[in-house]
Curated annotation (Swiss-Prot):
Any one of the GO CC terms: cytoplasm
Organism encoding this protein: Clostridium perfringens (strain 13 / Type A)
Protein name: Elongation factor Ts
Similarity field: Belongs to the EF-Ts family.
Gene Ontology MF terms in the entry: translation elongation factor activity
Disulfide partners: none
Pfam families noted in UniProt: EF_TS
UniProt key word Cytoplasm: yes
Length: 303
C-alpha cells in the first residue's frame, strides 16, 4: 500500500505533483529510488517538449572571487519574468556562474557537460529544473575573467536585467581601485559602450559612418572643402558615444572615463587601465514570439 508519507517524501525529493508521485510509487511497487527514476524519465520527456518554446526572459548573473582576481558573467534564459525571480532558478544561475569562473570551459556545450551538483552535469540539473518548474530554460552565454595585477569587478542592474563585468589592471593595491572599477561597471551598464577606445573601432564600421556623415553633409548643401572637417567632427562625436574611454562619465558629465582613470591613477600612484569588459542584457537579440490571444483560446477550446 502506498502511504501518504511516501508520496510526500517523493514530492519533496522531485518537486513533481502529488498525483504523479502516487502513480510513480504505484508503478514501482513503492520503491522510492525507482519512483524517482520514473519521474525523472517523465520529466525529461516534458523538458524535451518545452525545448521548442522561446526563452527570452531570465537573468544575468555574475560571480567574483573573494580576492577579486577572477570572475564570470552568465546569461540563463526562461520563458517568463515570474520564473526569472524563482529562488531555485536564481540559485542555479549563481552556481553556474561560480562554476564558469573556476573552470576552463570555452563553449556552452562544454559548460553543459561539466559537473555541477555531485555527479550531475549542468545539463542534467537544468533538465530537472525545467521539469520541476514547467518552463523551457537555456544557458545562453558566458564570459570568464582573470587578472594577475589588478582586479575583476561586476555590477548587476534591474535585478539581473543587465549585467556588467570589467577587468582593470594596476600594479598598486588600493581600495580606490575597487571603487573606480565599480564606477566603470556602472558606466558600462548605463551608457552601453561598444568599444574600449577609438583604436578598437573596426575600420569597416568607421568607414560606413564616414560615408553616412559625408552624404548627410553634402545633402545639407555644405561646401565640399568643409565636408571633410564636418565628417571628422561627427566621427569624434560618434566615438564619444560608443567608446568607453571617450564617453562622458555618468556621474560627472564634464569628465570622460579616460580622465577619471587618469585622476585615479595619480591617486593610487600607478596607471589604471581597463583591459576587458562585457555587458549582457537579458534576452537581447532573441526574437520573441508574438502570441495571438484568439488562437490560444481556440486551442484551449479544442477548436
Amino acid at each position: 500500500m502506498i502511504t501518504a508519507k511516501a508520496v510526500k517524501e517523493l514530492r519533496e525529493r522531485t518537486g513533481a505533483g502529488m498525483m504523479d508521485c502516487k502513480k510513480a510509487l504505484t508503478e514501482t511497487n513503492g520503491d522510492m529510488e525507482k519512483a524517482v527514476e520514473v519521474l525523472r524519465e517523465k520529466g525529461l520527456a516534458a523538458a524535451a517538449k518545452k525545448a521548442g518554446r522561446v526563452a527570452a526572459e531570465g537573468i544575468v548573473k555574475t560571480y567574483v572571487s573573494e580576492d577579486m582576481k577572477k570572475g564570470s558573467i552568465v546569461e540563463i534564459n526562461c520563458e517568463t519574468d515570474f520564473v526569472a525571480l524563482n529562488e531555485e532558478f536564481v540559485g542555479f544561475a549563481g552556481r553556474v556562474a561560480e562554476l564558469v569562473a573556476n573552470s576552463n570551459v570555452n563553449t556552452v556545450e562544454e559548460l553543459l557537460a561539466e559537473k555541477l551538483d555531485g555527479d550531475k552535469t549542468v545539463q542534467e540539473v537544468l533538465t530537472e529544473l525545467i521539469a520541476k518548474i514547467g518552463e523551457n530554460m537555456s544557458v545562453r552565454r558566458f564570459e570568464r575573467f582573470s587578472v594577475e595585477s589588478g582586479l575583476v569587478q561586476s555590477y548587476i542592474h534591474g535585478g539581473g536585467r543587465i549585467g556588467v563585468m570589467a577587468e582593470l589592471a594596476c600594479e598598486a593595491s588600493s581600495p580606490v581601485l575597487a571603487e573606480v572599477a565599480k564606477d566603470v561597471c556602472m558606466q558600462i551598464a548605463a551608457a552601453n559602450p561598444l568599444f574600449l577606445s577609438e583604436a578598437d573601432v573596426d575600420q569597416e564600421s568607421l568607414e560606413k559612418e564616414k560615408e553616412i556623415y559625408r552624404a548627410q553633409a553634402l545633402n545639407e548643401g555644405k561646401p565640399e572643402h568643409i565636408v571633410d572637417k564636418m565628417v571628422m567632427g561627427r566621427i569624434k562625436k560618434y566615438c564619444k558615444e560608443v567608446c568607453l574611454l571617450d564617453q562622458a562619465w555618468v556621474k560627472d558629465g564634464d569628465k570622460s572615463i579616460a580622465k577619471l582613470l587618469e585622476e585615479k591613477s595619480k591617486e593610487v600612484g600607478s596607471p589604471i587601465t581597463i583591459t576587458k569588459f562585457v555587458r549582457f542584457e537579458r534576452g537581447e537579440g532573441i526574437e520573441k514570439k508574438e502570441e495571438n490571444f484568439a488562437e490560444e483560446v481556440a486551442k484551449m477550446g479544442g477548436k
